[in-house]
């Protein structure tokens, strides 16, 4: 049988650098507070070669970075102790400009990456943007429990 088309908006946004980080922060916030995270609770700053995310939960500040390309990763590794979590995407901007995408003019690369990221962000808003509310994931967790750790994307 085929995979279900049922998914979450959060999964859609995984195609961009920072999508995994936002999903992790949403889950962490929910499991620590019992509440859904609103976007205005995450402070996002564009840095020279990465994005920085900060989220306060109680007295704790969770510090994250998302980085794309290996050359930028090498720079982030020099300051890795500043972060609790680092997301790494090999392709510039994430999968949206990766090897599986149609080859486009490189002189418009930044414009294309931004447009593709915006399209995914809009698509994310249409569906459920909270990974822990995905009914398919809940069903799998109920059925297989700890066995999933070895087979799911992590």
Predicted regions: what they are:
Residues 1-154:
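Iron-sulfur (Fe-S) cluster-binding modules
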